From Swiss-Prot:
Transmembrane spans: 27-47, 73-93, 108-128, 163-183
Compartment(s) where it occurs, according to its Swiss-Prot or TrEMBL record: Cell membrane
Key words of the record: Cell membrane, Cell wall biogenesis/degradation, Glycoprotein, Membrane, Transmembrane, Transmembrane helix
Domain of life: Eukaryota
Organism: Glycine max (Soybean)
Name this protein carries in UniProt: CASP-like protein 7
Record text on subunit structure and interactions: Homodimer and heterodimers.
InterPro entries to which the protein is assigned, alphabetical: CASP/CASPL (IPR006459), CASP_dom (IPR006702), CASPL (IPR044173)
Family of the protein in this entry: Belongs to the Casparian strip membrane proteins (CASP) family.
Amino acid sequence: MKGGSIEAGEVSKDASPRKGVARGLSIMDFILRIIAAVATLGSALAMGTTNETLPFATQFIKFRAEFDDLPSLVFFVMANAVVCGYLVLSLMISVFHILRSTPVKSRILLVALDTVMLSLVTASASAATSIVYIAHNGNTGANWFAICQQYNNFCERISGSLIGSYIAVALFIILIMLSLVAISRN
């Protein structure tokens, strides 16, 4: 009898920490999704509202730099907006995982969708980074001149908007690993 009661106590002790760890992973997943959504929203807003007009202009020509002059920066804004929307929608699934720690199929779906969104945000950040690099340094081989000496505020804002996007890339990698750990524990 004592042996049976000890075994039953051990089983209940093993089951309780598993649920606690799964719940902790789910709460961490929820928090990281909120942070990533704020980062991508901030990046999209910072880039999407960036423009600068030079103080000197002729009667017919205004020297103006806007993000939508460059397709790579438009892609950056759109991709960050899509990823932010996905992150906000995925918060519902994350709350479901907090309430119920055992759903494996929805975690597998999140891993797949998180991987797609990781690819999208990485591609957009890389494309925007190349444009920001050329804006700062130019390319003498192609006769592209650096514009950041003239459009200082524009360059600071587009450079700063990359930070949130790269934070989202790092958070997506962590989110995918957390989901895979949660799947392997079930």
